[in-house]
From Swiss-Prot:
It comes from the Archaea. Residues 14-200 form the YrdC-like domain. Its EC number is 2.7.7.87. InterPro entries: DHBP_synth_RibB-like_a/b_dom (IPR017945), Sua5-like_dom (IPR006070), Sua5/YwlC_C (IPR038385), Sua5_C (IPR005145), T(6)A37_SUA5 (IPR010923), TC-AMP_synthase_SUA5 (IPR050156). This is Threonylcarbamoyl-AMP synthase.
């Protein structure tokens, strides 16, 4: 039986937080909000507790977890050999949506790191998350609080749909702020390597680190062979409805015209294009002028698509600047790499 606890995200009630913290300390699982998406947490020092996360999510065990901390003392409990520059940067950017991959200490069990000698760590910028970690007295390992392959949850209702009856506690702390998962960067190598784009942008990373490596899998153009961090290797973020991603905006209208003749479609578009496609089902992602709004609505939109009873979702591409890079990473993966750059690409993915 899952206990659902509603907590004020701005002024978390300590008595309610303590209920969830007791569950963490006793080897249980708690879904909780962060500034990015909801996470499903367990004691990061308890391998058996962390296995419950994988079981609840149907998550492959070779897909590592992010360890969430509330202070720098906890950082040194889970990570070692941290470069001075990385420590300086962490003091600037934390709490915030940036995860570092570092060398792990012996205290971190293999269940958290998928047997690797590295650990992904971040300090979340959310009052409920920070208070939960503090009251638990241990770092909390947590991936997103959804069934594996499904869109990450940005509100408690989505967590309840996926995980009610599968976890001990779900904290309802309202809608998350960013709507996409944290940026992950591997700082055990030089230059650092971007493993997953997120709210902390490439432009911001370059200001802090100088040169960074951006592999193809970080762009969402292919899967990584080994998962050093979440979101690298497996199908992610996907609605159950087939999703096509039209990266070339110049042909979007033609693609929609072609597909809507044979299929029942829903369009995932910015509000600026809404009038142009009147008469077709639409999910408005936000405004072209505010990509943070688009990111915040992205996973909600994928879940909304599944409620519309259509054959296909057709999503338009967005500029890969700022958080747009993370939007396109998630969209490519959600589409199963069904990416349309020319009209001829349509025939690769759909029978016309």
């Amino acid at each position: 039986m899952t206990q659902i606890i509603k907590i004020d995200p701005l002024n978390p009630e300590i008595d309610k937080i303590k209920i969830a913290a007791d569950v963490i300390r006793n080897g249980g699982t708690v879904a909780f909000p962060t500034e990015t998406v909801y996470g499903l947490g367990a004691n990061a020092f308890d391998g058996n507790a962390c296995l419950k996360i994988f079981q609840a999510k149907n998550r492959p065990v070779d897909n590592p977890l992010i360890v969430h901390i509330a202070d720098f003392n906890q950082l040194f409990e889970v990570a070692k050999d941290i470069p001075d520059k990385v420590l300086e940067i962490a003091q600037i950017v934390w709490p915030g949506p940036l995860t570092f991959v570092l060398k792990k200490t012996e205290r971190v069990p293999k269940e958290v790191t998928a047997g690797l000698d590295t650990v992904a760590v971040r300090m979340p910028a959310h009052p409920i998350a920070l208070q939960l970690i503090r009251e638990s007295g241990v770092p909390i390992a947590a991936p997103s609080a959804n069934l594996a392959t499904r869109p990450s949850p940005t509100k408690a209702e989505d967590v309840i749909v996926d995980l009610n009856g599968r976890v001990d506690v779900i904290i309802d702390g309202g809608h998350t702020f960013f709507g996409v998962e944290s940026t992950i960067i591997n700082v055990t190598v030089e230059p650092p390597v971007l493993l997953r784009p997120g709210p902390f942008t490439i432009e911001e990373l370059k200001k802090l680190f100088g040169e960074i490596v951006i592999p193809e899998f970080a762009q969402g153009k292919k899967e990584a062979e080994i998962a050093l961090a979440p979101g690298m290797k497996y199908k992610h973020y996907a609605p159950n409805t087939r999703l096509l991603l039209v990266e070339n905006r110049n042909i979007f209208k033609d693609v929609v015209s072609l597909l809507s003749k044979k299929y029942k479609v829903a369009l995932l578009i910015p509000k600026e294009l809404s009038k142009e496609f009147e008469g077709l089902q639409q999910i408005i992602l936000g405004s072209d002028e505010n990509l943070y709004e688009v990111a915040r609505n992205l996973f909600d939109s994928f879940r909304e698509l599944d409620k519309l009873n259509v054959d296909l979702g057709i999503m338009i591409g967005f500029p890969e600047r700022g958080i747009g890079f993370a939007i396109m990473n998630r969209a490519r993966k959600a589409s199963g790499f069904s990416i349309i750059k020319a009209i001829s690409d349509v025939y690769k993915y759909v029978n016309i």
